Amino acid sequence: MAEKNTPSSPLDLFTPTFFQQPHAMLAQLRQSAPALPVTTPNGLRTWLVTRYEEARALLADERLSKDMRVGRHLMSRNFVDPAKQAEFLKETGERSQFPQVLSVHMLYSDPPDHTRLRRLVGRAFTSRRVASLQPRIAALTAELLDGVALHRRTDLMEALAFPVPFTVICWLIGVPPGDRTVFRRWSNLLVSGAGTEEVRQACVDMIGYLRTLIDSKRAAPDDDLLSDLVHTTADGERLTPDELISMACLLLVAGHETTVNLIGNGALALFRHPQVRDQLASDESLWPAAIEEFLRYDGPLTNATWRFTTEPVRVGDVVIPEGELVTISLGAAARDPERHENPDQLDIGRDNSGGIAFGHGIHHCLGAPLARLEGRMVLSQLFTRFPDMRLAVAPDELRWRSSLMMRGLEELPVLTK
């Protein structure tokens, strides 16, 4: 166990109050211990890591596994409530909410499987492909802003932050325009936390759709990422049908949700800091630095995805035992005063090298350049087109999503005039 008495959290985490204002609570946890056990709303015990130095090191630590074949078993052992444990075992059995096919991707794998998957995906998801999307993203954003201009008041999440990343993912996967309405419904259900049976049916429907889509790309390739993934080889290997489906779903959830939140959180930061808006209006070359600061200040992910200790792991003066679930708090680490001076201030001039909003190590997000590109293009066009846009409600009236992983707004009501 720990070198000293095992730390514990006296705070009531994962409540509506926490999701609304997490940073003060996370600061208290960061001061008390580098890692401490907490309990999630579904009764799962996990070790929360809150300091930057330890967080960055653990993101790249090979002693922490992400292989869900191991993870599901370990998760079942880490429930503090037997009733919750029984419910988990039932839900991960024959009636699993998320079929196994959805977890055979590189985010939930370790080397050598991860190495093979990332090499194959990396050959198709190139910097040239990302750069080629710029004119299309610019045109799409301009079209959506034309719609925003028609209304005095609008929800910026629904009108802009959601449709741009969703449409870009549809371009990458090659989802035809006529199928995007139902594809969006499935996507919303997958990330909504809605009733289990409804989500499970959406998974089944999406898997069936993607199998058919992949077959069509195999027979008649298009100029999209999914077609390239179907036909890409490395050392004579290809992605299997299940791996292709899982990768498409990973793009949809990880590649889409994070960008939605980057746009929404970045816009809110600028509404609340007009002096930064003025800086960007007078010097557009500052936008890349601004995006890095948005990722630090209120990034799109509160926590990294689950990891599991394969042996005892020291975190500062605490030792996490083998077989434990570990949650790395990206939000807490990003505001560690040992890393950043005045971390609670928005400062687009600060040095954000070494940022971990998109992870670190072998699991660093392959789609990070695309997310940054979308965030920069959408936000710069938004505030160029609407320099006087402002919040329609007080900041404390905004509602944040109750998510253990995502940090994003439910709505962002604004006034255009």
Write out the residue ranges for each language-model feature.
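Cytochrome P450
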Residues: 1-417
